[in-house]
């Protein structure tokens, strides 16, 4: 039996709704007390890149959660789901900090693809070990990127710095859980 081609509806923005999109990412003319608008917006721009990196990480973790197979399935499947939740919390914290700094966060898929800093996740259905080896690399990338923002902008705003320090600590812990599955018992992954 041949399946029929499904035609899905396509949303088209017209008139007034189209005009609304022109100002979608308009920034405020203010920021938090103690920072200049320029400094607040500079910090928020760096946070936007971290927002995008963490959005991608959350999508990768959920994708692997759905596609992991093999003897470690249930342990890894459940671990990844809890990690998705934690990374999504980080995304929300960063977006809210950006808004507080007066910049509209952009978590839309088009922006994610346009500004991505890592290659497309190459695995579909695969073993836990294969997924975890790749996820470890994506965690390393995100941890390094958080550290770069801290190095360049941490001194400008201690509040954003604290947020990124706490997230980096948690990302390192989540990566430790991944690496515990990869460790050969001699401390090698």
From Swiss-Prot:
Please report the organism this UniProt entry assigns to the protein.
Haemophilus ducreyi (strain 35000HP / ATCC 700724)
**UniProt family annotation:** Belongs to the Dps family.
A single Pfam family it belongs to is Ferritin
Q: What is the lineage of its organism?
A: Bacteria, Pseudomonadati, Pseudomonadota, Gammaproteobacteria, Pasteurellales
Name under which the protein is recorded: Fine tangled pili major subunit
Q: Which residues form the signal peptide?
A: none
Molecular function via GO: ferric iron binding; oxidoreductase activity, acting on metal ions
Location in the cell: Fimbrium
Which PROSITE patterns does this one have?
DPS_1, DPS_2
Function, as annotated, reads: May contribute to bacterial adherence, or be involved in the protection of the bacteria, or both.
* Gene Ontology cellular-component terms listed: pilus
